[in-house]
């Protein structure tokens, strides 16, 4: 099972020679090569992007990838309707607060996390199990933050997009949709809104306690 997947380091893909070595060590002539969607991705301990930009070509390619990705996202945002943009603002606000208020907790969990091998589907299965057992907003906001952090540290953009697409479907269940639409609705009573905000963020405390038990729950 996946252990502490939502923390730590760079995901790297299995090199072709790794697969070839595995095949050569297997006496069975019917060896089946892994399908691309089932490829195993490994966390590496390095989080310094300079470790992956060793040549001038690496730097130039990264610049091109950044430009294309930024243009795509900027264009996407311009096309979003007003309602969707308001949801973007809400998610920005709440996830940023989770990141800021519980930064030390995240660092502790990153230190606790061990190097593991897994697929995007392993990640999705673990997240789905956690969300089925926790109906609160906090756990969903924190999951978004964790998956986003994985994406930041992933050197495989194709796998990152796949992970974001799959996990967004899993995270956006009926509970999360109800929470976001409730928060976005106008409130006549500012005090009520503040209390609701604090109540919702308080759930994040329980959420972190849940995640901290994962290393004991998931073998």
UniProtKB/Swiss-Prot annotation:
Localisation per UniProt entry? Host mitochondrion outer membrane; Host cytoplasm
Q: Which Gene3D superfamilies has this protein been placed in?
A: Blc2-like
Taxonomic superkingdom: Viruses
- What drives induction of this protein's expression? Expressed in the early phase of the viral replicative cycle.
The leader peptide range reads none
GO BP annotations listed? regulation of apoptotic process; symbiont-mediated suppression of host apoptosis
Q: Which UniProt keywords apply?
A: Early protein, Host cytoplasm, Host membrane, Host mitochondrion, Host mitochondrion outer membrane, Membrane
According to its record, what are the GO cellular component terms?
host cell mitochondrial outer membrane; membrane
Q: Hey, which family's this protein in?
A: Belongs to the orthopoxvirus OPG045 family.
Describe the protein's quaternary organization and the partners it interacts with: Homodimer. Interacts with host pro-apoptotic protein BCL2L11 (via BH3 domain). Interacts with host NLRP1. Interacts with host BAK.
Function field: Plays a role in evading host innate immune response by inhibiting host inflammasome activation. Interacts with and inhibits NLR-mediated interleukin-1 beta/IL1B production in infected cells. At the host mitochondria outer membrane, interacts with the BH3 domain of host BAK and prevents BAK from binding active BAX. In turn, host apoptosis is inhibited.
- What is the protein's given name? Apoptosis regulator OPG045
Q: The organism's lineage?
A: Viruses, Varidnaviria, Bamfordvirae, Nucleocytoviricota, Pokkesviricetes
